[in-house]
Amino acid sequence: MRLNTLSPAEGSKKAGKRLGRGIGSGLGKTGGRGHKGQKSRSGGGVRRGFEGGQMPLYRRLPKFGFTSRKAAITAEIRLSDLAKVEGGVVDLNTLKAANIIGIQIEFAKVILAGEVTTPVTVRGLRVTKGARAAIEAAGGKIEE
């Protein structure tokens, strides 16, 4: 065993820094912050995205677009999800009961993704052309 081969015990944790506990600790007086300047002050430091006074990137670039509020309450339903609904009738309430869509959803559209094997009746939902053809080919029907 030599001094250069010593290491802490497995799973041990290094003690945290104790600031301002005298000059001999190495972290007294200025507490590791150096002398003066913005970063030495309480609450000192610059905000995220600050570029030293230069016009920051997020302000140099133009604004564009918006976030649709309707998108948060709209869902897409795959054809393969229709089989998870019990009873053969698919509408917003049965989709919510089967945990396919969230309770906040107000609009839904069935899309051609996956496949439908059992005949189902889709009621009160929008349906794409491809999904409509697949549902009718499986013996199901769409009611507006």
From Swiss-Prot:
Gene that this polypeptide is encoded by: rplO
GO cellular component, one term: cytoplasm
Keywords: Ribonucleoprotein, Ribosomal protein, RNA-binding, rRNA-binding
PANTHER family named in the record: 50S RIBOSOMAL PROTEIN L15, LARGE RIBOSOMAL SUBUNIT PROTEIN UL15M
Bias (Gly residues) ranges: 21-31
GO molecular-function terms, A-Z: rRNA binding; structural constituent of ribosome
Protein known as: Large ribosomal subunit protein uL15
Region Disordered, annotated ranges: 1-54
GO biological process, any: cytoplasmic translation
